[in-house]
Regions:
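Hydrophobic alpha-helical packing residues
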Residues: 25-26, 111
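Beta1/beta-strand and adjacent pyrophosphate-binding region of the FAD-binding site
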Residues: 3-17, 34
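Dinucleotide-binding Rossmann-like beta1-alpha1 core, especially the glycine-rich loop
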Residues: 51-120
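A secondary-structure boundary/capping signal
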Residues: 12, 37, 49, 88-90
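Glycine-rich FAD pyrophosphate-binding loop
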Residues: 26-47
Length: 120
């Protein structure tokens, strides 16, 4: 593949962030975008990450971003025809002390306030 001599946007790094930027620019109609990766897409740090997407975060905006990411990964395979390997899993947290139980109850309340699906 020949690399263009110039582009409106040049993204260096084909990890999850670089690919996301290229994807979202393409979704809003940008055509003059080049993504540079020295090896294969997502073969660096992204490849070695656990790939867990817990929805509840410390702030509402970060929780919204995590929820959006999970929803996007669920639909990418259908949209692109490429397998993502994404599997939606839940999690279980156990409290061994009363203090930890109170902390989990506060987290559950925050999760509900942020629109995160939760079972107690």
């Amino acid at each position: 593949m020949t690399i263009p001599k110039k582009a409106k946007v040049v993204i260096i790094g084909g990890g999850v962030i670089g690919c996301s930027i290229a994807y979202h620019l393409g979704k809003i109609g940008w055509k003059d975008v080049v993504l540079l990766e020295r090896k294969q897409l997502t073969c660096g740090t992204t490849w070695h990450a656990a790939g867990l997407i817990a929805q509840l975060r410390a702030t509402k905006n970060m929780t919204r971003l995590a929820k959006y990411s999970q929803e996007l990964y669920q639909k990418l395979e259908k949209e692109t025809g490429l397998s993502t390997g994404f599997k939606r899993n839940g999690s279980i947290t156990v409290a061994l002390t009363n203090e930890r139980m109170e902390e989990l109850k506060r987290s559950a309340g925050m999760a509900r306030a942020f629109g995160v699906e939760i079972d107690e």
